[in-house]
């Protein structure tokens, strides 16, 4: 897939808006995980709620940083997860703001430049914003299922929930 600089900038405007619309919803789900439930696991193969939260946070920031850098670094943990949901939510908010500011500063040519994704695919940088969004939504959905199963407050996402009806 090839994009001109102008096409990449137009697509970026659309996709950045999507990421910035979804991020506050993800933040709301992260904040809803009770601190005393961080060890909760849904099923034998599930991650702990805390591990799932930290993976979501780090991955979203990793995508934004990789897009801005024009290359995806080897995925490695950036330290231990913060102790509380509040601290994790703050880390998400800060990291996403910084990463997306870098993406917004990219030129059309930078947005159009292909990035190799582990020799699986090579797409224009801007298209990975959709991967960021999809990945975040996927794990946010998992976390909302954890919240319901642990009998915690489930925030509204696109419409009302039993705990936050419209």
Language model regions located:
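Amphipathic, well-packed alpha-helical segments that form the structural scaffold of globular domains
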Residues: 27, 31-34, 100, 104
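Exposed loop/turn and edge beta-strand positions of beta-sandwich/beta-sheet ligand-binding modules
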Residues: 9, 43, 82
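Hydrophobic packing residues in well-ordered alpha-helices of helical domains and bundles
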Residues: 15, 19, 85-92, 96, ...
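Short, low-complexity N-terminal intrinsically disordered segments enriched in polar/charged residues
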Residues: 2-13
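Acidic catalytic patch
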Residues: 36, 104-119
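Helix-adjacent hinge/juxtasegments
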Residues: 65-106
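Short, contiguous alpha-helical
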Residues: 2, 16-30, 37-78, 116-166
């Amino acid at each position: 897939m090839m994009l001109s600089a102008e096409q990449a900038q137009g697509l970026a405007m659309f996709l950045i808006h999507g990421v910035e619309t979804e991020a506050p919803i993800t933040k709301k789900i992260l904040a809803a995980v009770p601190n005393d439930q961080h060890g909760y696991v849904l099923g034998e193969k599930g991650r702990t709620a805390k591990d799932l939260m930290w993976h979501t946070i780090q991955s979203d920031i990793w995508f934004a940083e990789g897009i801005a850098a024009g290359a995806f670094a080897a995925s490695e943990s950036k330290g231990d997860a913060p102790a509380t949901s509040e601290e994790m939510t703050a880390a998400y908010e800060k990291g996403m703001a910084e990463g997306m500011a870098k993406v917004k500063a990219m030129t059309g040519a930078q947005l159009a430049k292909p990035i190799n994704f582990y020799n699986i695919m090579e797409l224009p940088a801007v298209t990975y914003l959709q991967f960021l969004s999809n990945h975040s939504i996927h794990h946010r959905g998992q976390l909302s299922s954890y919240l319901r199963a642990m009998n915690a407050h489930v925030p509204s996402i696109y419409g009302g929930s039993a705990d936050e009806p419209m």
